[in-house]
Each structure stands twice: as C-alpha cells, then as structure tokens.
C-alpha cells in the first residue's frame, strides 16, 4: 500500500489535532470553577494560639516559619495557615 500525499497530510493533521486536544485538556483541568482560587489552608492543633504563647501573633509567626502567607487562630488550640 503506497502512502499518498493526501493520506500523509491527513495523518499529520490528525496527530496535530490530538496533541492540541491533550494539551488544552491538561491545562484547563488545573483551573476549575469560576477561575477564582480560594485560599489553600492547613490547620494544626498546636500551642501558638494559646494566649501565654502569643495568641494570633504566635500563629502568624508559626505559619511564617512553615512558609505560609498568614495564620489565623480558631479557638485556643487550632492554628490555620493560609497561602
């Protein structure tokens, strides 16, 4: 079976279409919803939120050491760190 110019062009366009489809699907799956990214956060049951350890400032310092942007105390034993 001979490969004609028409078949070769159809094959190349098919490959290009598949590659672009896979590329577009993989990037669009990263952004979900309306495009507004909520803050990612992690909560720790630690003592920085206790008043004698520092309270809110202690939680912020703890989160800064953990490479987060900020921290927020939930009660006196839970410190939530946000990116």
Curated annotation (Swiss-Prot):
Localization in the cell: Secreted
GO process annotations (BP): defense response to fungus; killing of cells of another organism
Record's keyword terms, sorted: Antimicrobial, Disulfide bond, Fungicide, Plant defense, Secreted, Signal
Cellular-component GO terms for this entry: extracellular region
Lineage: Eukaryota, Viridiplantae, Streptophyta, Embryophyta, Tracheophyta
Main subcellular location of this protein, as a coarse class: secreted
Keyword NAD recorded: no
Organism: Arabidopsis thaliana (Mouse-ear cress)
Disulfide bonds: 43-81, 49-73, 59-79, 63-80
Record-given protein name: Putative defensin-like protein 110
Family label: Belongs to the DEFL family.
Position of the signal peptide: 1-24
